Amino acid sequence: MLVIVTENVPPRLRGRLAVWLVEIRAGVYVGNPSKRLREFIWEQVEQGLEEGNAVMAWSTNTESGYDFQTLGRNRRLPVDYDGIRLVSFLPPQDVDGVL
């Protein structure tokens, strides 16, 4: 299972993601691609992101049962805590430089 959530991305990237995944809500895509296709899809996100941000989560053989990666500016920062991936939240001013 793969889930990608996007914010403030160009319409062409949203259309591109809809080629391989189902957009179940604005900016939320799900599917069950192979690892190779998942990596290709993420490359498309990296190339088309512009000023937006995205997160991709997928099922895998880890202790938590999933893994994820992020791209772009947002308040959520992935951290590794004893082999478990967690999310740390930054204060709003750390993202934009202002309150």
Question: Residue locations for each model-derived region?
Answer:
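Basic nucleic-acid-binding interfaces
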Residues: 1-99
